């Protein structure tokens, strides 16, 4: 059974509701990279690590560059395994051994080959972001949080995922589903 055969949300954006109760996810926009009956995994796409650029990470890892290194900020993908790196990128780049399609023209790769591609060694993806850590949910946990109105969902687009206007991504994601932040209560619940 593939993720698309059920009520799974792989490839969609999660939008944190105000008052989520966890400062790690306050105003977060998370791209779900995997979601099935056993687990869910996603990367926050609007949490820059101030002062840490992709170029600086590549230098620290001693990845030699054939181009000017990108100054895009590294993102904090989530609270799990924060020392592990993940690259979200357009699907024009693929590393067959380690790239996973997320959908909507976006792939996820976590290998040294993609870092070399970012440094200009190989065919580079048209757009990309580097995130440290990920957000993870156990079986049924994300579904429960959605039922409790902790998260809204929307379709991703390249601007929301790869754009560098991180402070506005949350309000832009809400606008994409026809909601403004002023319309949302900080208190979740059901009637």
Whereabouts are the PLM-identified features?
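A short aromatic-anchored loop/beta-hairpin motif
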Residues: 1-131, 135-191
